[in-house]
Structures are given as C-alpha cells and as structure tokens.
Regions:
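Inter-Walker segment of RecA-like/P-loop motor cores
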Residues: 1-49
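Glycine-rich nucleotide phosphate-binding loop and flanking beta-alpha elements
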Residues: 42, 59, 112
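Generic beta-strand/beta-sheet core signal
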Residues: 29, 37-39, 54, 80, ...
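Non-catalytic, compositionally simple segments
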Residues: 9, 62-185
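Walker B catalytic acidic pair
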Residues: 52-58
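Extended hydrophobic-aromatic, low-complexity segments
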Residues: 46, 61-62
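Conserved aromatic-histidine-acidic binding/catalytic patches
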Residues: 44, 56, 161
C-alpha cells in the first residue's frame, strides 16, 4: 500500500486492496491475489501456490506442517494448457508445464535447540542436492548499512547501550544461530 503512490506499475497491476481486522487481501487484475492468514489451527482449508512463512520460527511446528503446508496441495495450471494446442496432451505430458508450488521462509536466526534450526539444516542439505530446488541465504545487518536502510551510528549506539545483548544481536542481526543442539553438553 505504501509503495503504490510511488509506483505507476503497482497502480496498474493492483485491482483492489482490502485490509480489515479480519482480512488482508491484495487482488490483481490478472486474477492473482495475495492473502494474509493467521498462523493458527483455524486457518484450515485455504489454497496457495506460493506460501511465505514470515517469522516462521514463531509458528507452531504442528500448525506449519498440519495446516499451513496443506495450502500447497495443488499446483498452478497455466491457462495455455486449456487451449486447443495443449488440452489434448496426456496428464503426464501436461505435468512438465505445471508450476511447482513454492515455500518461502523468512526469519532471524534463533536457538539451535529449536525446531527451526533443524528445518534450516534440512534446507541446506537439500540445496546441495542438484536434483532438488532449494535456496537459503542470510542477510546480516552490514548489508542494510551498505544499502542505506540502517544507520551505522544508530547501530553503534545500540551496541553501546547497557542493556545490549550480544547473543540476541547475533541471532537477529548477524544470522547466527546460538547454543547447542539437543543432547549436547
């Protein structure tokens, strides 16, 4: 919403924006939409092709696996597959044109004994497998300073504060996981 006044392209593409206490949806002219859902057990029944799990480490693992990931049940079928040229193709042949659903996880790092660390490790392993399509990256605070999104003097001030926690800073701003994994001592 806040970017629309400065972007002619966004104004051309976005049909309608609805933000109420119980709903947040951005509808596009091409019939696509972005919908925000609360990460709880009541979110059952929705469908999506791309799911962004913001601050995913704060989501209950059972809600993530048993409710939210179920949104990705069916793949998006491009409209051209319904045209005369393609509609006769066997199901197996059509599969190569389907857009695979995507999951995007956003979060700061956290404690290594939390389930989210195991998830990140799994993503790293899968990223190394050439038969899979995974990606992970960390964007530490130095990048924000370089890009002018974070003031370096403000960072220095925060670090000099008597209540500064280097552990929390490392997890939140340096993409560093903290502690030991289960069973380590």
């Amino acid at each position: 919403l806040e970017l629309m006044p400065n972007s002619e392209n966004l104004r051309k593409e976005i049909k309608k924006v609805t933000v109420t206490s119980g709903q947040a949806i951005v509808e596009f002219h091409n019939t696509s939409y972005i919908e925000v859902v609360v990460a709880n057990d009541n979110a059952r029944g929705g469908r999506a092709n791309i799911f962004i799990f913001d601050e995913f480490r704060q989501i209950d693992i059972d809600v993530l696996n048993d409710v939210l990931k179920k949104y990705l049940a069916s793949e998006r079928e491009p409209e051209f597959l319904k045209t005369e040229k393609y509609k006769h193709l066997p199901k197996q042949e059509k599969r190569k044109y389907l857009d695979r659903n995507k999951q995007i996880y956003l979060s700061s790092a956290f404690f290594k004994d939390h389930w989210s660390y195991k998830e990140v490790q799994s993503i790293c392993r899968n990223m190394l497998d050439d038969t899979k399509r995974y990606f992970i990256c960390g964007l530490p605070y130095e990048l924000s300073i370089k890009e002018g999104m974070l003031n370096e003097d403000s960072v220095k001030d925060e670090m000099s504060n008597a209540n500064f926690s280097s552990i929390k800073w490392s997890m939140e701003m340096e993409c560093l996981w903290f502690g030991d994994v289960d069973g380590a001592f």
